[in-house]
Amino acid sequence: MKVKDLEQGKFYTTKEYINDTLVRQRWWYITLREDKNIMAMVVEKLRDNPLSFYSDFGVWYSDAFFKDISFTECEKKHFTWAVEDIIKELKAIEL
C-alpha cells in the first residue's frame, strides 16, 4: 500500500532493508488525513534500537521520498509495543 492509500485512525508499519538486512522500521498511527496532507504519530527504530518518536509527523503524499515506501496495515498493539520499547530505553538512561 502506498502513502496515498493511508486512512485516518489506522496503524501501519514500514520497513527499509539494505542487502536483505532490516535497517529501519517505523510504526505509524494516522491522526489526520485531509486531501494530500497526512499527520501521524511515528515510532522509528534503527537496527532494532529505539531511535525516535514523533507525536506530530507531517507527510505530503506527493513527496518523492514517501512515494517509494510501501506501508502495511498493522494492529494497534504493534505500535504500542514500539512506544513501550522507547519508554524502556529512556528509563534506562535515567539510571
Regions found by a protein language model. Name each.
Residues 4-18:
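Short coil-to-beta transition motif at edge beta-strands of beta-rich domains
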Residues 9, 24-25, 57, 84:
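Glycine-centered loop/turn motifs
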Residues 14, 18, 33, 46, ...:
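Acidic surface patches and DE-rich sequence motifs
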Residues 22-35:
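Short beta-strand-centered aromatic/proline hotspots
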Residues 47-95:
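Intrinsically disordered, low-complexity, charged/polar segments
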